[in-house]
Amino acid sequence: MTDNDSEYIRQTEATRVRVLSEALPYIQQFAGRTVVVKYGGAAMKDSTLKDKVIRDIVFLSCVGLRPIVVHGGGPEINSWLDKLGIEPQFKNGLRVTDAATMDVVEMVLVGRVNKEIVALINQAGGLAVGLCGKDGNLFTARPQGQEGIGFVGEVSNVNIKILDTLASNGYIPVVSSVAADETGQAYNINADTVAGEIAAALGAEKLILLTDTSGILKDYKDQSTLIPKVDIREARELIVNGIVTGGMIPKVNCCVRSLAQGVRAAHIIDGRIPHALLLEIFTDVGIGTMILGSQFTS
């Protein structure tokens, strides 16, 4: 071993010790607290990123947090619709979900994507349980109300008992965003919305949305204009003033709604960064945008 090798090892080990030391107060602060993670975007498609997200989720559980995962699966839904000769259609950013499409959405989200995530968490040493809204009436649906979009729903009610029971016993609930209304009709619900409503119902410490952007940017073309922290009032103003636009609007609105119902902090982070979850939760600087409820800004 050369002197350069020895120096590199010393520096690497020193960095690891510093990172662990920096994480300790956050681990102590958040022990026993619930963190709802919306898992989607590139972090679901890239196998290397997927492995790191799964390991992060298991790490959260191992150090005493109570992670709950809500996942999307749009690209895989589109892939299966294509295989079955059904053309994906969208209206105002929402997937038009007729009866045939709803069958595919449920098959893919509940039967494939959910079970893959569960298996990966279990392989990484966690204890995951797969659920959708229909299981134990975890959450029920109502029509979204927009004409011409079919079985696209909103969350009507959340029953937290099953989540509390699982999380308090060391299990990691993995939730797909399919639910039924009071007649038993299945609905496709936006996964961000489901994550926000579950976080609100549980009074979660954090709602974290893994996205394909750095967070909220003052200039969406310039990654260096990341806004690291805002409160709920400032977040609303960013929408009104046109700083937050396009697909970021429903994500920020989802965060604002959950904060207004008692979630302490919401985070929009870049899931393309390896170990994004741990970097956001357990480091002083973080990597994305944190939105705080007005009662917690001090």
Curated annotation (Swiss-Prot):
Reaction(s) the record says it catalyses: N-acetyl-L-glutamate + ATP = N-acetyl-L-glutamyl 5-phosphate + ADP
Amino acids binding substrate: 73-74, 95, 188
Pathway(s) the chain acts in: Amino-acid biosynthesis; L-arginine biosynthesis; N(2)-acetyl-L-ornithine from L-glutamate: step 2/4
Gene Ontology BP annotations: arginine biosynthetic process via ornithine; L-arginine biosynthetic process
EC main group: transferase
Family to which the UniProt record says this protein belongs: Belongs to the acetylglutamate kinase family. ArgB subfamily.
Physiological role: Catalyzes the ATP-dependent phosphorylation of N-acetyl-L-glutamate.
Protein name, as recorded: Acetylglutamate kinase
